[in-house]
Regions:
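Histidine-centered acyl-transfer/condensation active-site motif
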Residues: 117
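Walker B catalytic acidic pair
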Residues: 120
Length: 172
């Protein structure tokens, strides 16, 4: 249960029991009955991210690229990345910011996509995963901690069973 490292032992025991009884998937399915969101393209993701950014981080630098990345989870063991590329243009240094979200998020509920987008947007202001970072995440998404935990449960479910709970191809 690598995704749940650092959580208290009694909580981990509850998760082990849910896994043993094959009830973890059903629990998550009940919690997120709406299923998969309809943000399936890079263009739609860019629109969604810039909408959240303009709502909560108007003064932050603009994003030059936002995209789903097929290789992200496998290569970097990450679900999202934020990068800043600096280039010399004329006599000035110009920075381009981009956010990449693992393609896994095409097939999950909107709440989890929002959680990872909020996480990556928070990195535009706070580099480290510290108290200020999580306070910013909680400001943008009040249920951030629960959503992150539920996503970790889902990743554990995928790791143990290999079965997705929602199918992106059957969304409304």
């Amino acid at each position: 249960m690598k995704y749940l490292a650092g959580y208290p032992a009694p909580l981990l025991e509850q998760v082990r029991q849910l896994l043993a009884e094959d009830k973890l998937g059903a629990l998550l399915g009940k919690r997120y009955p709406d299923g998969v969101h309809d943000i399936q393209t890079d263009r739609a993701l860019y629109g969604y991210v810039t909408e959240l950014k303009s709502e909560f981080m108007r003064k932050a630098e603009p994003l030059s690229k936002v995209m789903f990345d097929n290789k992200l989870h496998v290569i970097r063991n990450a679900l999202g990345t934020h990068t800043t590329v600096s280039r010399v243009q004329g006599g000035k240094l110009k920075a381009k910011r981009e956010i990449r979200v693992a393609s896994l998020f095409k097939g999950v509920p909107l709440a989890w996509l929002r959680m990872i987008v909020v996480h990556e947007l928070a990195h535009m202001k706070e580099r480290e995963h510290d108290k200020a970072f999580y306070a910013l995440c909680m400001h943008m998404e009040p249920d951030y901690q629960q959503l992150e935990f539920d996503l970790r449960l889902y990743l554990t479910h995928l790791d143990m069973n290999g079965r997705r709970l929602w199918d992106a191809s059957s969304r409304p």
